[in-house]
Amino acid sequence: MNLMKRSLVPLMTAGTLLLTAAAPAPPDDGKLRIICFGAHPDDCEIQIGGVAALWAAKGHHVKLVSVTNGDIGHWREAGGPLALRRKAEAEQADKILGVTSQVLDIHDGELLPTLENRRLITRLIREWKADVVIAPRPNDYHPDHRYTGVLVQDSAYMVTVPFFCPDVPCLKNNPVFLYNPDSFQKPNPFQPDIAIAIDPVIQKKLDALDALESQFYEGGANGYPELIPTDPAKQQERHRQVRAGFEQRAQNLAHRFRSKLAEFYGQDKAASIHYAEAFEICEYGRRPDTEELKKLFPFFGE
């Protein structure tokens, strides 16, 4: 893999500007500004694709950032060509959701919680003038996932410090920082502070995940040739299986966090919710009460 990576350096260099170009900050129009960080060009879409679509439908500004370029996330491809392919996939997925997409040019599998990367994340949060920041918890099987969580945690206070990254104006108010759910139990399990019904947008989320073909239809880093059918009927069945898997995942979250859904929607409405996403408040950001959470997730009167 090192030899392959070296042979593709010129291609990576050619793609650097494309991979790192930042979208302009949203206008000051009174709408919410949400930025989500994932380790790879599929993580944000899996974790918050439903809520992102709900926010976007109301005109709020949502940005999904992949902290690495995903350039080793396939069993058959790697380097610059894969990075550019995954960037294009993420952009298509995020277009379906109605949100802004950005893929940073850091090698997949090589993310570290350095000062340079802390500054990078801090600048991105400030430039978006975020009200809400979402990231994985720093307890995970994948080092890129862990360090994405650490980097966002480490930015939670620094975004308000004027002379840290003084080239970008600091935020006057610390955003609300939220964690995505996971199933890891040690040192402590995920504890939801809010759960959101995504029934109205579940098909849109599945359509967005459809666009990430290298990961979900070709198997990503753990795929193999037999996983990719050539017969049209089998291809259609493969797509059906992948969509059904993600649909089941959203159903499992609704079942797992049914009591939290009831807190926000009431028992009767919660019992009828089929699909959900959930979030835990990070203690290092602003600590919203229930009323502020309802303003940040303005979906409960629907």
Kindly give the residue locations of the regions a language model identified.
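Active-site rim/loop-helix segments in enzyme catalytic domains that contact anionic ligands
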Residues: 21-128, 150, 158
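Flexible, active-site-proximal loop/turn residues at the rims of small-molecule/cofactor binding pockets
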Residues: 50, 139, 183, 285
